[in-house]
Amino acid sequence: MLLHIPALFTADEVSRIRAALEQAEWADGKATAGYQSAKAKHNLQLPQDHPLAREIGEAMLQRLWNHPLFMSAALPLKVFPPLFNCYTGGGSFDFHIDNAVRDIQGGRERVRTDLSSTLFFSDPQDYDGGELVIQDTYGLHQVKLPAGDLVLYPGTSLHKVNPVTRGARYASFFWTQSLVREDSQRTLLFEMDQSIQQLTRDVPEHPSLIRLTGTYHNLLRRWSEL
């Protein structure tokens, strides 16, 4: 499932965040890549312990944990602290699949990368290229969203970032360990949850809503891992 979540941050918030990112000191993005990915990765990245990365990352996590669409789709158990990258001057990241497990800095905890996310901090008209290209069973999807918008997709997906030939593309990326590791099961639960919410608005007193909600929770109980 590939899901677009709009306006996680407002235009004013994005403007302030981008201004701060533009003034930050960036490092070579290869530092956080695996062996294979490092050969394909050509970008800049904020160090994980950078104060700005922590500040923006904490604000992102607060928004995400209170966002009904993200919660419904991701069913998050753990979220890896957001990382931040910059693509400019031909920077790109060739096709790769993210590492299955990521160590949170310091090695105190691990996160299984069931879901990947990118939050855009640059508007599409501010740079050329830089599309996030995601491959799934239905083909290739090119994603280039407005600043403040997020895309959520399975961590098992082959994906790349096209070269940025003009301007700069600022973004955050992170991974989520879901209560439900299998994408097809998460998709079914998401569609069921969205249908229940719509029916609750349309026919709030319908007696079948109780049974349908019970079925959702019984499936979640069967498939979830804690």
From Swiss-Prot:
Residues given in the record as Fe cation binding sites: H96, D98, H159
Keywords for the protein's UniProt record, in alphabetical order: Dioxygenase, Iron, Metal-binding, Oxidoreductase, Vitamin C
Gene Ontology biological process: DNA damage response; intracellular iron ion homeostasis
Cofactor(s) named in the record: Fe(2+); L-ascorbate
Gene3D superfamilies, alphabetized: q2cbj1_9rhob like domain (2.60.120.620), Rabenosyn, Rab binding domain (4.10.860.20)
EC main group: oxidoreductase
UniProt domain Fe2OG dioxygenase: residue ranges: 78-178
Enzyme Commission identifier(s): 1.14.11.-
UniProt cross-references to InterPro entries, sorted A to Z: Oxoglu/Fe-dep_dioxygenase_dom, PKHD_C, PKHD_hydroxylase, Pro_4_hyd_alph, Pro_4_hyd_alph_FE2OG_OXY
Sequence positions that bind 2-oxoglutarate: R169
Database matches in HAMAP family: Hydroxyl_YbiX (MF_00657)
Name this polypeptide is given: PKHD-type hydroxylase PSPA7_5129
Source organism: Pseudomonas paraeruginosa (strain DSM 24068 / PA7)
